[in-house]
Amino acid sequence: MEQKNLNINQASGSKINTELAVPIFQSRRRHRPRQGLKRKKGFKRDDDSGGSSESSNEDMRDNIPIVSGRKKTVRLNRLQRESEQFENSALKDINVEYQSNLSATGESVNTTTVSAINEDTREVILGRPSPKLANQSTLPTELFQSQNDYSRFLPKRKDFEKKSQVGPVLSSNASTVRMNTIIDYQPDVCKDYKLTGYCGYGDTCKFLHMREDYKAGWQLDREWDSVQEKYKKGAKLEEGMVKNEKKEDIPFVCLICKKDYRSPIATTCGHHFCEQCAITRYRKTPTCIQCGADTKGLFSVDKNFDRLLKNRKSKNDEAVKQKVGGFESNNSATTEVSERKDREASFQGFADTLAKPNTSAQQKMPSLGDNSNTIISKYFIREITESNIVHFKRLVRVVLEASYSDKFYRLVLKNPDYARIATFEDKFVGAISSLVAEDNSLYVTVLCVLAPYRCLGIGSLLIDHVKKTAINNNIDRISLHVQTTNESVIKWYTAHGFKIVKQINDFYRRLENKSAFYMVCPLSAHNNIISNH
């Protein structure tokens, strides 16, 4: 209603009532205080007049306009924008091209018109270093020069060989670093350092750097054992007995001549022979007849050997006084040769009784571990096994002076029925081995007896065992080869039923006499005799 009245009054030209007017609020923009916009005092120059007062300076600062830090943006109208775009498009239409093959050199440049302030600028323009005059001297060292000129005065680092560097190499920056190295040395001496005095590992080598000689453990043990042998109970050697050598190991005759020792000598392997016999054998072969080792022609006189023979002879004389064959021998002066004849006679008497049927029980010696042992007094034969194959090899090498391959000894072990080894007082003195051929015959490959134990019936015992085994296996004959010059062996085989069939030349390739007799023994004629055995 009031608004309607107001409109009516205005239309009628009446005076407007101020009490009914609408209030209008307008926020006034606040300005920054003028005192905070005062400039700082500038740097006072010397030429400024000192009479000017501070009031005049303040009036001048008031007249300086204040520049705002905000960038003022100016808006362009349409005409200005079109003119600016036209100028930019005109610049784009203008295309400037150039081409150069860079073939110009410094010599083609006209040097007469080139002037430079210093030598460096001239070298850049001309493209070549400027020649120095002969009388031009270098600058004194007191003047300042460029860094390149000073670098040539620095001393060069001397070259060093890398081989001379041993051990851990530290960097130059680690001069203040302290290092403790602990090396666990092995109980061995460095071989390189001991021989040459130089080791590539240096201080890091785990072996000891010593050049002295030290005894190994086994050497110390050997010396200790040799000292302790003197204090062992019952270890005292007999007077005249060689150290570490039993009395039974020395044959009572020379193995080469089969006679008593004459001027006995000892070889490097510890065996004794006659001096003349050893020299004669060395001319043919350098091996020892007893062990097969190389003597190298070195023989020495054993001073205790004669005394040892006398001690053994005295003990044998005492043994002869005992009962032999039911009677006591009162001959105290019996020699070793007579003793051997007595043993041969006793063994021959036992062999004669063996040919006749005997109903009395035979007393046997205790066996040494083999099941099928033939016991005959002190002599008996065993099967060849892995435990005694070494003794079989030694007999073949010493008696026959032959060396067979391992394949041959494996064949001997595969045919245990036709291979035996004879022993005397636990010593291996003889052996025999045979192989079955394809024509149902038996071929004797080895038959050997040591020289001191021959003519005692050991060889006959071995060949009779092979014959008996062959007859039980229905084998017709036994064959073998004998050297034509070995008359005693040919006579022995003939006495045991062998006959010469033919002669073969060049049978033994490594012997001087290479011819051999091929001998055969038929088993049909020996059936009755062997069966009684």
Curated annotation (Swiss-Prot):
GO terms for molecular function: DNA binding; N-acetyltransferase activity; ubiquitin protein ligase activity; zinc ion binding. Gene3D superfamilies: 3.40.630.30, Zinc finger, CCCH-type, Zinc/RING finger domain, C3HC4 (zinc finger). GO terms for biological process: mRNA cis splicing, via spliceosome; snoRNA splicing. Residues 1-69 are annotated as: Disordered. It is found in: Nucleus. A zinc finger (RING-type) spans 254-292. Residues 27-43 have a biased composition (Basic residues). Belongs to the CWC24 family. Involved in mRNA splicing. This is Pre-mRNA-splicing factor cwf24. It comes from Schizosaccharomyces pombe (strain 972 / ATCC 24843) (Fission yeast). The gene is cwf24.
